[in-house]
Amino acid sequence: MTEIAKNTNFNKASKAKNDEFYTQLSDIERELKHYKKHFKDKVVYCNCDDPRVSNFFHFFSYNFEKFGLKKLIATCYKNQSMDLFSQNKSEQAIYLVYEGDKNGNMVPDPAEIGIRELKGDGDFRSKECIELLKQADIVVTNPPFSLFREYVAQLLEYDKKFLIIGNGNSITYKEIFKNIQDNKIWLGVTKPQLFLIDNKENFAKYCSWIFR
């Protein structure tokens, strides 16, 4: 696929309702290694992920002790299929809580991960998800691009530290760009390469990590 075609498809996807993108574990590892000291004794919240298949939850649960985390929380829309993310497509949303290794094998076993049902659909804007957000010190995830402005506005409203992924256009949004100009938000070190969930086609001509 040409670069022009990639960019065109990416822009179309970011405007569509189905704008869920898959984040590679390797991209998470490459970026997160630069922030290790900032996670010590912190509660991390991943609120746009399916923790059963999310590489964000995988990374933080397997590096819980290495990063010195206090708690890991992840919310999601429950999926019809275990290998796909979904949005408002299922009858029950869940959230997971992991507080570290208990049996000494340094692996996040199922018995060590608390699985709890949400009353609503798992939307990050819902009251119960906001209550979980209030517990968090740092939010790390890949939010839907179509809701990026609203998503960042919420994080700023609740004065949260965050490390999230946005598409190339997101840094030009006036709300985002103003915060970058004012040194309230910064661009990350690496460039993630995202894949559209539905067909795994590469749309990542340009994406950025954004943090506060």
Name the predicted role of every residue range.
Residues 1-212:
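Class I S-adenosyl-L-methionine-dependent methyltransferase catalytic core
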